[in-house]
Amino acid sequence: MASSVMSSAAVATRGNGAQASMVAPFTGLKSTASFPVSRKQNLDITSIASNGGRVSCMQVWPPINMKKYETLSYLPDLSDEQLLSEIEYLLKNGWVPCLEFETEHGFVYRENHKSPGYYDGRYWTMWKLPMFGCTDATQVLAEVQEAKKAYPQAWVRIIGFDNVRQVQCISFIAYKPEGY
């Protein structure tokens, strides 16, 4: 019985020569003595990674007589061909088109909710029902024309909903009243 028991020290010292040379021993951290102690200070602020110094300033959106509406509102009004292209993109992604209109405030303002963020406190009125199963962009454009005829002083926007994820994926102004 005593002959079958080995000491743990004997097992630990018995190793293969190939295994011992596979892992290099830890030598510790490098000494900082090789770095120069006195360095020339760099006073050039353009090399510092910060938010100041070398910043390209952009003008902000002028708030007087230039209201911000929705996506693409900084562009000129979209033509019918451009609207068709946007609607085809919406349909190609499998989103459900829906039209909404607003007769008083087609721009961002705070009425029902005062904190900033995605929700801006506006409620738009839905034009008819969402166009489930619509595959033709001209049908959506015809509804835009009908909404313009019924409410010529209203903003009309097109929204694309993803009915699987249950989120709004796209929204843009299709019509602005005269003078805006």
Curated annotation (Swiss-Prot):
Under Gene Ontology molecular function, one entry of this record is: ribulose-bisphosphate carboxylase activity
What GO biological process terms does the UniProt entry carry, in alphabetical order? defense response to virus; photorespiration; reductive pentose-phosphate cycle
Highest taxon of the source? Eukaryota
Cysteines engaged in disulfide bonds, as pairs:
none
Question: Chief subcellular site?
Answer: plastid
Keyword list (alphabetical) reads: Antiviral defense, Calvin cycle, Carbon dioxide fixation, Cell junction, Chloroplast, Host-virus interaction, Photorespiration, Photosynthesis, Plastid, Transit peptide
Q: Name one GO cellular component term.
A: plasmodesma
Cellular compartments annotated: Plastid, Chloroplast; Cell junction, Plasmodesma
* Residues annotated as transit peptide in the record: 1-56
Q: Which SUPFAM superfamilies match?
A: RuBisCO, small subunit (SSF55239)
Q: What other note does the entry give for this protein?
A: The basic functional RuBisCO is composed of a large chain homodimer in a 'head-to-tail' conformation. In form I RuBisCO this homodimer is arranged in a barrel-like tetramer with the small subunits forming a tetrameric 'cap' on each end of the 'barrel'.
What role does it play? RuBisCO catalyzes two reactions: the carboxylation of D-ribulose 1,5-bisphosphate, the primary event in carbon dioxide fixation, as well as the oxidative fragmentation of the pentose substrate. Both reactions occur simultaneously and in competition at the same active site. Although the small subunit is not catalytic it is essential for maximal activity. Involved in antiviral defenses.
Quaternary structure (record): Heterohexadecamer of 8 large and 8 small subunits. (Microbial infection) Binds to tobamovirus movement protein; this interaction seems required for viral systemic movement.
Q: Which family does it belong to?
A: Belongs to the RuBisCO small chain family.
Stored HAMAP family? RuBisCO_S_bact
Q: What is this protein called?
A: Ribulose bisphosphate carboxylase small subunit, chloroplastic 3
Q: Which organism does this record belong to?
A: Solanum lycopersicum
Upper lineage: Eukaryota, Viridiplantae, Streptophyta, Embryophyta, Tracheophyta
